[in-house]
A protein has these predicted regions:
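Conserved SAM-binding strand-loop segment of SAM-dependent methyltransferases
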Residues: 81-92
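Conserved class I S-adenosyl-L-methionine
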Residues: 1-35, 37-46
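Core SAM-dependent methyltransferase catalytic element
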Residues: 171-189
């Protein structure tokens, strides 16, 4: 993982300005589901665009990423937008997610299949997971992309068997290079 960290640090160090906030259409479309004041975790947060959006919806946000530089950029974006987020530098390959802690977990453009069970377990009962990443159709746009980091059609719908799927677009449309799912942790009975 160290070489991955170095690669991401280098990428973000080369950024000369704090970027404008980019709102992912998925967050905008499903904002009503994500509103609230509970704790949210943004995995592989990068420069924290998703984290800032969640904070704007009222959430207390922990932005987790392997790149300190990216999180520092994210803190500046948050300050400019008038919200607070907590940045946490961690290697997702070695950082255990705490169980039953978060009301919302987001993960955009990062694929580590081994984390799928831990993501579901980290949700409080009734909590929401919002997951979006590249699928195999992304190879049409970026042929050299490593296919190990791409979801296969139908894979995402099967990846969180203990959660209830609220909505899932799972790569069946060849023109969509992303798959996404929103899933809910079961309520305790």
């Amino acid at each position: 993982m160290r070489s991955d960290v170095d690669r991401w640090e280098e990428k973000y160090r080369d950024a000369t300005a704090v970027p404008s906030l980019i709102s992912d259409p998925l967050l905008v479309h499903y904002a009503d589901l994500l509103k609230g004041d509970g704790l949210a975790l943004d995995l592989a947060a990068g420069t924290c665009h998703t984290s800032v959006q969640l904070a704007r919806l009222g959430r207390q946000v922990v932005a987790l990423d392997c790149s300190l530089t990216a999180l520092q950029i994210g803190q500046r974006i948050a300050a400019r937008e008038g919200v607070r987020i907590q940045g946490l530098v961690a290697d997702l390959d070695n950082w255990p997610l705490p169980q039953s802690t978060f009301e919302v977990i987001t993960c955009f453009r990062y694929l580590n299949r081994e984390l799928f069970p831990a993501m579901g377990n980290a949700l409080k009962p009734g909590g929401l997971l919002l997951y979006k990443t590249f699928n195999q159709h992304h190879l049409r746009e970026v042929p050299r992309f490593n296919p190990n980091y791409l979801l296969r059609p139908g894979e995402l719908a099967r990846s969180f068997p203990d959660l209830e799927l609220v909505v899932c677009r799972d790569g069946v449309n060849a023109r969509e290079p992303y798959s996404f799912a929103i899933a809910r942790s079961p309520q305790k009975t």
